[in-house]
Amino acid sequence: MTSEQIIDRTKKWITDVVIGCNFCPFAANVVKQQTVFYKVEETTEMDACLDSFVHEMKRLDDNASIETSFLIFPNAFQKFDDYLDLVSLAENRLKRDGYEGVYQLASFHPLYLFENSDENDPANYTNRSIYPMLHLLREESIDKALENYKSPESIPFRNINFAKEKGLAYMKMLRDAL
């Protein structure tokens, strides 16, 4: 599959699942404004993947027109535990490089599993993507969006309730239809 095809599938997942289920009430606006950047990282080497993550932070530094960036790993981190290692290293790198409070890291994986949850819990599908990916968001933009959103702390609970109400079969079908 080409990078373009991977990006197209990722965009469809964002449109159909993230926006369609309203998991992120702010996503529709940045997609509509076309201020999302997508980067496919083909390597499977951890160091190269971290270098790519650092490059994405610098890309956001250099391009104010980009609100958010998805770094997609179609060939790496097939095991969720390996992916969690990447997330931990990326979060540490974000802090070490002075980006804490500047960028926020969100994580998505095909086998995403919330702590203390069962693998068949439909709530996991709020973060189950079609590829392992890291999502960088500008903290300033998040803060601005939250100013106009009533009860932002309720978003995760609303998402979990939605997924559980729809059920495992529906959430799995929605994601796997891509």
Tell me what each language-model feature is.
Residues 1-178:
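Expand to "…catalyze enediolate/carbanion chemistry for C-C bond making/breaking, isomerization
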